[in-house]
Amino acid sequence: MRDAIIRKNANLVRTCLSCLSLCLPCISNGSPGVDICQEPIAESNLSIAYYDNEKTSFERNLGETNRDNFSTDLQFKMNDNWIFGVGHRSAILDVERLELQTNGYLHTFFVPVHRLDQSDNKSFRFSIAPALSASSNVTKDPNEYTADALQLLVALVWGEQISDRLGLSYGICGDHRFGEYQVYPVIGINWQPHADWLIELGFPASRLSYEVTKSLTSVLQIAPNGNEWYVKNKSLDKHSQFVYEAYLLEWALSWRAHQKIMLTASVGREFHSRYEMTLLNETRIRVSSDPTTRVGVSLAWFC
Protein backbone atom coordinates (compact mmCIF):
# COMPACT_ATOMS: atom_id res chain seq x y z
CA MET A 1 0.00 0.00 0.00
CA ARG A 2 2.76 2.42 0.97
CA ASP A 3 4.71 1.62 -2.22
CA ALA A 4 1.59 2.23 -4.30
CA ILE A 5 1.12 5.66 -2.73
CA ILE A 6 4.77 6.52 -3.34
CA ARG A 7 4.49 5.50 -7.00
CA LYS A 8 1.29 7.51 -7.38
CA ASN A 9 2.91 10.62 -5.90
CA ALA A 10 5.97 10.16 -8.09
CA ASN A 11 3.79 9.97 -11.19
CA LEU A 12 1.97 13.10 -10.08
CA VAL A 13 5.24 14.99 -9.68
CA ARG A 14 6.43 13.86 -13.11
CA THR A 15 3.14 15.00 -14.63
CA CYS A 16 3.41 18.41 -12.97
CA LEU A 17 6.99 18.85 -14.14
CA SER A 18 5.95 17.92 -17.66
CA CYS A 19 3.19 20.52 -17.54
CA LEU A 20 5.68 23.09 -16.30
CA SER A 21 8.03 22.38 -19.17
CA LEU A 22 5.21 22.96 -21.65
CA CYS A 23 4.10 26.15 -19.93
CA LEU A 24 7.52 27.60 -19.22
CA PRO A 25 6.97 30.55 -21.57
CA CYS A 26 3.87 31.49 -19.54
CA ILE A 27 5.88 31.76 -16.34
CA SER A 28 8.89 33.59 -17.73
CA ASN A 29 6.91 35.84 -20.05
CA GLY A 30 8.96 39.00 -20.59
CA SER A 31 7.08 39.91 -23.75
CA PRO A 32 5.88 43.52 -24.06
CA GLY A 33 2.46 42.06 -24.88
CA VAL A 34 0.15 39.35 -23.56
CA ASP A 35 0.06 35.78 -24.90
CA ILE A 36 -3.53 34.62 -24.40
CA CYS A 37 -3.08 31.78 -26.91
CA GLN A 38 -0.67 29.85 -24.69
CA GLU A 39 -2.21 27.14 -22.51
CA PRO A 40 -2.24 28.43 -18.90
CA ILE A 41 -0.11 26.60 -16.38
CA ALA A 42 -2.09 24.01 -14.42
CA GLU A 43 -1.23 25.39 -10.96
CA SER A 44 -2.00 28.51 -8.95
CA ASN A 45 1.13 30.65 -8.97
CA LEU A 46 2.71 34.08 -8.62
CA SER A 47 5.55 34.92 -10.99
CA ILE A 48 7.78 37.91 -11.71
CA ALA A 49 10.27 38.39 -14.54
CA TYR A 50 12.81 40.92 -15.79
CA TYR A 51 14.35 41.14 -19.27
CA ASP A 52 17.08 43.44 -20.56
CA ASN A 53 17.48 44.19 -24.28
CA GLU A 54 20.82 45.43 -25.58
CA LYS A 55 20.97 48.77 -27.40
CA THR A 56 20.04 48.60 -31.08
CA SER A 57 19.97 51.05 -34.00
CA PHE A 58 17.06 52.17 -36.16
CA GLU A 59 17.35 51.95 -39.92
CA ARG A 60 18.75 54.94 -41.86
CA ASN A 61 20.69 55.92 -38.72
CA LEU A 62 17.59 57.63 -37.30
CA GLY A 63 18.51 56.82 -33.72
CA GLU A 64 19.13 54.14 -31.14
CA THR A 65 16.96 52.42 -28.58
CA ASN A 66 17.10 49.93 -25.74
CA ARG A 67 14.29 48.42 -23.68
CA ASP A 68 13.74 46.80 -20.29
CA ASN A 69 10.73 44.53 -19.78
CA PHE A 70 9.08 43.62 -16.48
CA SER A 71 6.19 41.23 -15.93
CA THR A 72 4.06 40.11 -13.01
CA ASP A 73 1.43 37.35 -13.13
CA LEU A 74 -0.91 36.07 -10.44
CA GLN A 75 -2.95 33.02 -11.40
CA PHE A 76 -5.56 31.14 -9.39
CA LYS A 77 -6.77 27.70 -10.45
CA MET A 78 -10.29 27.42 -9.06
CA ASN A 79 -10.90 23.86 -10.31
CA ASP A 80 -10.28 21.70 -13.39
CA ASN A 81 -12.47 23.99 -15.50
CA TRP A 82 -11.76 27.56 -14.37
CA ILE A 83 -8.54 29.57 -14.07
CA PHE A 84 -8.50 33.27 -13.19
CA GLY A 85 -5.68 35.76 -13.00
CA VAL A 86 -4.33 39.29 -13.14
CA GLY A 87 -1.16 40.44 -14.84
CA HIS A 88 1.02 43.40 -15.69
CA ARG A 89 3.53 44.01 -18.48
CA SER A 90 5.85 47.01 -18.32
CA ALA A 91 8.33 48.22 -20.92
CA ILE A 92 10.80 51.05 -20.31
CA LEU A 93 11.83 52.38 -23.71
CA ASP A 94 14.85 54.66 -24.09
CA VAL A 95 15.15 56.32 -27.52
CA GLU A 96 18.05 58.53 -28.59
CA ARG A 97 17.91 61.27 -31.30
CA LEU A 98 14.12 61.01 -31.72
CA GLU A 99 11.49 62.91 -29.72
CA LEU A 100 8.40 60.77 -29.23
CA GLN A 101 4.87 61.49 -28.04
CA THR A 102 5.50 59.31 -25.01
CA ASN A 103 7.64 59.30 -21.91
CA GLY A 104 8.77 55.76 -22.76
CA TYR A 105 7.05 54.06 -19.80
CA LEU A 106 4.57 51.62 -21.36
CA HIS A 107 2.16 49.46 -19.36
CA THR A 108 -0.36 46.71 -20.05
CA PHE A 109 -2.69 45.57 -17.25
CA PHE A 110 -4.89 42.54 -17.99
CA VAL A 111 -7.34 40.16 -16.30
CA PRO A 112 -7.34 36.70 -17.95
CA VAL A 113 -10.15 34.17 -17.51
CA HIS A 114 -9.79 30.62 -18.86
CA ARG A 115 -12.51 28.01 -19.27
CA LEU A 116 -11.23 24.48 -19.94
CA ASP A 117 -13.20 21.37 -20.87
CA GLN A 118 -11.86 17.90 -21.53
CA SER A 119 -13.46 14.58 -22.43
CA ASP A 120 -11.75 11.40 -23.58
CA ASN A 121 -8.98 12.47 -25.98
CA LYS A 122 -10.42 15.89 -26.83
CA SER A 123 -10.21 19.28 -25.15
CA PHE A 124 -11.48 22.83 -25.59
CA ARG A 125 -10.32 26.11 -24.07
CA PHE A 126 -11.92 29.55 -24.17
CA SER A 127 -9.74 32.38 -22.87
CA ILE A 128 -10.56 36.06 -22.60
CA ALA A 129 -8.59 38.95 -21.12
CA PRO A 130 -9.72 42.59 -21.05
CA ALA A 131 -6.66 44.84 -20.92
CA LEU A 132 -5.57 48.44 -20.48
CA SER A 133 -2.48 49.25 -22.56
CA ALA A 134 -1.06 52.77 -22.43
CA SER A 135 1.79 55.03 -21.34
CA SER A 136 2.20 55.69 -17.63
CA ASN A 137 0.77 59.22 -17.76
CA VAL A 138 -2.46 57.66 -19.06
CA THR A 139 -2.70 54.57 -16.85
CA LYS A 140 -2.26 56.56 -13.63
CA ASP A 141 -5.21 58.88 -14.42
CA PRO A 142 -8.62 57.24 -15.11
CA ASN A 143 -9.80 60.51 -16.67
CA GLU A 144 -7.37 59.87 -19.53
CA TYR A 145 -8.74 56.41 -20.36
CA THR A 146 -10.30 56.06 -23.81
CA ALA A 147 -11.38 53.17 -26.01
CA ASP A 148 -8.00 53.41 -27.77
CA ALA A 149 -6.29 52.32 -24.54
CA LEU A 150 -8.46 49.21 -24.12
CA GLN A 151 -7.78 45.76 -25.54
CA LEU A 152 -9.83 42.56 -25.64
CA LEU A 153 -7.69 39.45 -26.01
CA VAL A 154 -9.42 36.16 -26.88
CA ALA A 155 -8.57 32.56 -27.74
CA LEU A 156 -10.63 29.52 -28.72
CA VAL A 157 -8.47 26.43 -28.98
CA TRP A 158 -9.47 22.81 -29.58
CA GLY A 159 -7.15 19.88 -28.89
CA GLU A 160 -7.13 16.23 -29.88
CA GLN A 161 -4.80 13.46 -28.72
CA ILE A 162 -4.25 11.35 -31.82
CA SER A 163 -2.01 8.79 -30.10
CA ASP A 164 0.13 8.42 -26.99
CA ARG A 165 2.88 10.51 -28.59
CA LEU A 166 1.01 12.72 -31.05
CA GLY A 167 -1.45 15.56 -30.46
CA LEU A 168 -3.15 18.25 -32.53
CA SER A 169 -4.37 21.71 -31.53
CA TYR A 170 -6.21 24.32 -33.62
CA GLY A 171 -8.36 27.39 -33.18
CA ILE A 172 -8.33 31.19 -33.42
CA CYS A 173 -6.76 33.95 -31.34
CA GLY A 174 -7.08 37.71 -31.23
CA ASP A 175 -4.34 39.83 -29.63
CA HIS A 176 -1.54 42.35 -30.22
CA ARG A 177 1.45 40.03 -30.44
CA PHE A 178 1.84 41.06 -34.10
CA GLY A 179 1.62 44.74 -33.16
CA GLU A 180 -1.79 46.03 -34.22
CA TYR A 181 -4.77 43.90 -33.19
CA GLN A 182 -5.17 40.80 -35.32
CA VAL A 183 -7.43 37.75 -35.31
CA TYR A 184 -5.48 34.81 -36.71
CA PRO A 185 -5.64 31.01 -36.93
CA VAL A 186 -3.77 28.81 -34.47
CA ILE A 187 -2.54 25.33 -35.32
CA GLY A 188 0.02 23.04 -33.78
CA ILE A 189 1.27 19.46 -33.87
CA ASN A 190 2.72 18.08 -30.63
CA TRP A 191 5.05 15.11 -30.94
CA GLN A 192 6.73 13.39 -28.01
CA PRO A 193 9.38 11.08 -29.52
CA HIS A 194 10.76 10.29 -26.04
CA ALA A 195 9.53 10.70 -22.48
CA ASP A 196 11.99 13.59 -21.98
CA TRP A 197 11.39 15.37 -25.30
CA LEU A 198 8.45 17.32 -26.71
CA ILE A 199 8.38 18.96 -30.14
CA GLU A 200 5.61 21.50 -30.82
CA LEU A 201 5.45 22.76 -34.41
CA GLY A 202 2.81 25.30 -35.32
CA PHE A 203 1.66 28.86 -35.83
CA PRO A 204 2.17 31.40 -34.36
CA ALA A 205 4.64 29.68 -31.99
CA SER A 206 6.86 26.60 -32.07
CA ARG A 207 8.96 25.15 -29.27
CA LEU A 208 11.27 22.30 -28.32
CA SER A 209 11.20 21.10 -24.69
CA TYR A 210 13.67 18.78 -22.99
CA GLU A 211 13.46 17.53 -19.40
CA VAL A 212 17.14 17.43 -18.43
CA THR A 213 16.36 16.06 -14.96
CA LYS A 214 13.21 15.85 -12.86
CA SER A 215 13.88 19.40 -11.63
CA LEU A 216 15.59 20.95 -14.68
CA THR A 217 13.85 21.77 -17.98
CA SER A 218 15.14 23.37 -21.17
CA VAL A 219 12.89 25.11 -23.74
CA LEU A 220 13.73 26.63 -27.13
CA GLN A 221 10.89 28.74 -28.58
CA ILE A 222 10.14 31.08 -31.47
CA ALA A 223 7.07 33.33 -31.32
CA PRO A 224 5.79 36.83 -32.17
CA ASN A 225 6.70 39.43 -29.57
CA GLY A 226 4.80 42.69 -30.10
CA ASN A 227 2.18 44.97 -28.56
CA GLU A 228 0.34 48.28 -28.98
CA TRP A 229 -0.08 51.17 -26.53
CA TYR A 230 -2.12 54.37 -26.39
CA VAL A 231 0.36 57.13 -25.50
CA LYS A 232 0.29 60.83 -24.64
CA ASN A 233 2.92 63.52 -24.37
CA LYS A 234 3.91 65.18 -21.10
CA SER A 235 1.29 67.94 -21.33
CA LEU A 236 -1.42 65.40 -22.30
CA ASP A 237 -2.53 67.47 -25.30
CA LYS A 238 -1.22 65.05 -27.97
CA HIS A 239 -1.95 61.36 -28.30
CA SER A 240 -1.18 58.50 -30.68
CA GLN A 241 -0.78 54.74 -30.94
CA PHE A 242 2.67 53.27 -30.34
CA VAL A 243 3.08 49.91 -32.11
CA TYR A 244 5.91 47.41 -31.80
CA GLU A 245 6.26 44.10 -33.64
CA ALA A 246 9.03 41.52 -33.68
CA TYR A 247 9.83 37.83 -33.55
CA LEU A 248 11.71 36.31 -30.63
CA LEU A 249 13.89 33.20 -30.67
CA GLU A 250 14.64 32.33 -27.06
CA TRP A 251 16.22 29.57 -25.00
CA ALA A 252 15.17 29.21 -21.35
CA LEU A 253 16.40 26.94 -18.57
CA SER A 254 14.04 26.31 -15.66
CA TRP A 255 15.04 24.89 -12.30
CA ARG A 256 12.39 23.63 -9.90
CA ALA A 257 14.44 24.45 -6.82
CA HIS A 258 11.63 23.49 -4.46
CA GLN A 259 8.11 22.13 -4.72
CA LYS A 260 6.84 25.71 -4.52
CA ILE A 261 9.69 27.62 -6.22
CA MET A 262 10.95 27.69 -9.80
CA LEU A 263 13.80 29.83 -11.19
CA THR A 264 14.20 30.52 -14.90
CA ALA A 265 17.06 32.10 -16.84
CA SER A 266 16.93 32.82 -20.55
CA VAL A 267 18.73 34.37 -23.50
CA GLY A 268 17.01 35.35 -26.73
CA ARG A 269 17.33 37.15 -30.02
CA GLU A 270 14.68 39.58 -31.33
CA PHE A 271 14.56 40.09 -35.09
CA HIS A 272 12.27 41.59 -37.78
CA SER A 273 11.65 44.38 -35.27
CA ARG A 274 9.52 47.32 -36.42
CA TYR A 275 8.23 50.42 -34.66
CA GLU A 276 5.27 52.55 -35.74
CA MET A 277 5.16 55.77 -33.72
CA THR A 278 4.36 59.46 -33.79
CA LEU A 279 7.02 62.05 -33.10
CA LEU A 280 6.51 65.13 -30.97
CA ASN A 281 6.12 67.21 -34.17
CA GLU A 282 3.14 65.01 -35.23
CA THR A 283 5.13 63.11 -37.87
CA ARG A 284 4.09 59.45 -38.09
CA ILE A 285 6.98 57.11 -38.88
CA ARG A 286 7.47 53.37 -39.32
CA VAL A 287 11.03 52.16 -38.88
CA SER A 288 12.84 48.86 -38.50
CA SER A 289 15.64 48.19 -36.05
CA ASP A 290 18.61 45.83 -36.02
CA PRO A 291 18.31 42.44 -34.32
CA THR A 292 19.00 42.59 -30.60
CA THR A 293 19.96 40.14 -27.85
CA ARG A 294 18.12 40.02 -24.56
CA VAL A 295 18.69 38.18 -21.29
CA GLY A 296 16.15 37.52 -18.57
CA VAL A 297 15.40 35.93 -15.25
CA SER A 298 12.13 34.99 -13.55
CA LEU A 299 10.93 33.59 -10.26
CA ALA A 300 7.68 31.67 -9.77
CA TRP A 301 6.06 30.65 -6.50
CA PHE A 302 3.37 27.96 -6.58
CA CYS A 303 0.51 28.12 -4.11
Segments the model singles out, each with a brief description of its role:
Residues S44-N53, F84-S90, F126-A134, Y170-G174, ...:
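Transmembrane beta-barrel strands of outer-membrane/channel proteins
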Residues S90-E99, P204-R256, K260-E282:
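Outer-membrane beta-barrel translocator/channel fold
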Residues V186-W191, D196, L253-W255, R286-C303:
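Outer-membrane beta-barrel "beta-signal"
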Residues D80-V86, S119-F124, D164-L168, D196-I199, ...:
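Repeated loop/turn-to-beta-strand initiation elements of outer-membrane beta-barrel proteins
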Residues L74-M78, V111-D117, L156-E160, W191, ...:
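Residue-level signature of outer-membrane beta-barrel architecture
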Residues N66-L74, Y105-V111, L132, L150-L156, ...:
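Hydrophobic, lipid-facing positions within transmembrane beta-strands of outer-membrane proteins
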Residues N29-E96, S218-Q221:
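Short glycine/proline- and aromatic-enriched beta-strand/turn motifs that initiate or cap beta-hairpins
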